[in-house]
Amino acid sequence: MFRNQYDTDVTTWSPTGRLFQVEYAMEAVKQGSAAIGLRSRSHVVLACVNKAQSELSSHQRKIFKVDDHIGVAIAGLTADGRVLSRYMRSESINHSFTYESPLPVGRLVVHLADKAQVCTQRSWKRPYGVGLLVGGLDESGAHLYYNCPSGNYFEYQAFAIGSRSQAAKTYLERRFESFGDSSREDLIKDAILAVRETLQGETLKSSLCTVAILGVDEPFHFLDQEAIQKVIDTFEKVPEEEEGEGEAGEGEAEAAEAAPAERGGGVAGDQDVAPMEM
């Protein structure tokens, strides 16, 4: 039984009860650059990896402002993400105009999930190939949701999507219990450290990541590269200092071993040479 018999139409079920077109859209999310979100009781931080197509091109935006109290980070097809972020912005504006109050984050996420779900039921449409991390703050507190191309949505304390996101998830799973009481600065630091986990040995620089934050009495805004680099320097320089101290200790030990050898004459010198030849 071949898969390609059942994946030509989004409304065709396979005998095992799967919609392959929807699964393909979910795979597209895994191909995009990593996006990370985490929240405390008062703040939400969104971060993403800036991935350029080539050295000659600029990177595409992966984090969008929806309203002063809502932002979204995407992974997958950027064009689909732009369309959905525009839809979210329109919904927020319409709600504010009609009710003269900010749109609750949960309600916006439900509207977004309904829009994505319709695309899994119409033969003339295709699922959106993008995953969205929606972070926001309303009367009930800070929220972080993940919207899936299938139309499902889930609320998280912290989450990561996109390429090599499993490494970031592992880091977040070790730390998430402390996020609720984290300060603004600690939350930003944890977000950047999670981004570093997805780079697989590549040196983390402010040009490689984008960070946005919103919170109580703090509208949604992006951190500038200088602020991001200052945070990076706080944990990138520590290993270098420890390495320098280690090298100094090794140098002192070698000097201490060399002193008796010089006093002992040629025999000690031969003993020093032998291990190097082995």
Curated annotation (Swiss-Prot):
PROSITE patterns under this entry? PROTEASOME_ALPHA_1 (PS00388), PROTEASOME_ALPHA_2 (PS51475)
Q: Where is this region: Disordered?
A: 238-278
UniProtKB keywords? Acetylation, Cytoplasm, Isopeptide bond, Nucleus, Proteasome, Ubl conjugation
Q: Where in the cell is it found?
A: Cytoplasm; Nucleus
Instruction: Name one cellular component (GO) term.
Output: plastid
Q: Name the Gene Ontology biological process terms.
A: protein catabolic process; response to arsenic-containing substance; ubiquitin-dependent protein catabolic process
Q: What induces it?
A: Slightly induced by heat-shock and high intensity light.
Regions of biased composition (Acidic residues) lie at 239-255
- Cysteines joined through disulfide linkages: none
Q: Which InterPro entries match?
A: Ntn_hydrolases_N, Proteasome_alpha, Proteasome_alpha-type, Proteasome_alpha1, Proteasome_asu_N, Proteasome_sua/b
Q: Is Thylakoid there in the keyword field?
A: no
Name positions with the PTM N-acetylmethionine.
1
Q: Quote the disruption phenotype from the UniProt entry.
A: Enhanced thiol accumulation and arsenic tolerance. Mutation can be complemented by overexpression of PAF2.
Per the record, the covalent cross-link Glycyl lysine isopeptide (Lys-Gly) (interchain with G-Cter in ubiquitin) lies at 51
Question: What binding partners and quaternary form does the record give?
Answer: Component of the 20S core complex of the 26S proteasome. The 26S proteasome is composed of a core protease (CP), known as the 20S proteasome, capped at one or both ends by the 19S regulatory particle (RP/PA700). The 20S proteasome core is composed of 28 subunits that are arranged in four stacked rings, resulting in a barrel-shaped structure. The two end rings are each formed by seven alpha subunits, and the two central rings are each formed by seven beta subunits. The catalytic chamber with the active sites is on the inside of the barrel.
- Please state which protein family the record places this protein in: Belongs to the peptidase T1A family.
Role according to the record: The proteasome is a multicatalytic proteinase complex which is characterized by its ability to cleave peptides with Arg, Phe, Tyr, Leu, and Glu adjacent to the leaving group at neutral or slightly basic pH. The proteasome has an ATP-dependent proteolytic activity. Negatively regulates thiol biosynthesis and arsenic tolerance.
Question: What name is this protein filed under?
Answer: Proteasome subunit alpha type-1-A
Can you name the source organism? Answer: Arabidopsis thaliana (Mouse-ear cress)
